[in-house]
Amino acid sequence: PGVAGMARDEAPDSANSQFFLMRHPYPALDKRYTVWGRVVSGLDVVRALKFSPNPDGIVTDPDRMTRVRVPGDLPEGERPTVRVLSTSSAPFRALVEDTRAARGADFSACDIELPVEVN
């Protein structure tokens, strides 16, 4: 949950117009879309967006983003502080081993969800 990505075709640099925010796992998209981020704060907002139960995914009255700001565009005093577990740390290595043990033969790097703190 919280994956951010782009629709694309097989050509390089083809992800240019359709993005998505995943509310729940959806294995049919695995290896077909380009992931570029993860929602680390505000997943409740993502889950509140309207969605379509239909296979075509078309929402008849979709929510609209009327204003979007990324943290780098905010005045310095308004930017959130985001802390992520260092991938060179002992706790990260322990997380990898615990995840590997839990997933067994199904383990992949995508199974590791780094702990994040946003203030």
Report each predicted region and the residues it spans.
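Cross-family detector of peptidyl-prolyl cis-trans isomerase
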Residues: P1-N119
